[in-house]
Amino acid sequence: IAVGGYGRGELHPYSDIDIQILLAKNNKKKYQKDIEQFLTFLWDINLEIGQSVRSIKENQQEAARDITIATSLIESRTLAGNSELLETVMLQIERKKIWKTKEFFEAKKSEQFQRHDKHEDVESALEPNLKEAPGGLRDIQNIGWISKRHFGASDFHDLVEREFLEPGEYKDLIRGRNFLWKVRYGLHMISDRREDRLLFEHQRSLAEIFGYEDDAKSLGIEKLMKQYYREVLSLRELNDVLLQLFDEEILRSRE
């Protein structure tokens, strides 16, 4: 099964490809040789693999213990094999059994607060992390995880239909996400590795690639960074508003 960013279908050139080999029972030894050969093949063709091997029961136990694992399973999908195995896992980790809505919401809010706290310094502002900084991709994903867990939302447009987002706000969210995706893709390509920080050494190259030209008023690099700051400010404000609305909705729920 595909998990994480691979499960969401959000890969960039040097993203890890996160997979799990899902077994019906805890009988890894029976398949150990086949599993090793399969993983060796993936490494031999130079894929950056993040992998785990778990049974249905182990998934339920690990997800109940660790919200990161629970989150990765929420957005998982079957790649090959018996799809009923993943369907069983999803039943085992549904919100009535582990990480009930309020618990999940509070845990994800706490994660976000701690993440923001690490990226509020001047250095992080000048060379921001596209994923982890406030208003970054992780904040967008957090909204997706919470809305999927509580409302069963399949995408952000569901939030428009549920009147959490205005159509214009939805467009702002998608525009901001696409901008961050574009910059992250460019970072991977020019650094020739997985890179999520918008380092000084890459900013000029990216500005040139994306057509931000110097003029009498400002440099191309300044134009790039101004757009970055505008987009993440908008995304952070949307994130704050949505979390507040979710908080009110979840507090009203009977679960």
Where do the PLM segments sit?
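A nucleotide- and high-energy phosphate-metabolite-utilizing enzyme signature
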Residues: 1-255
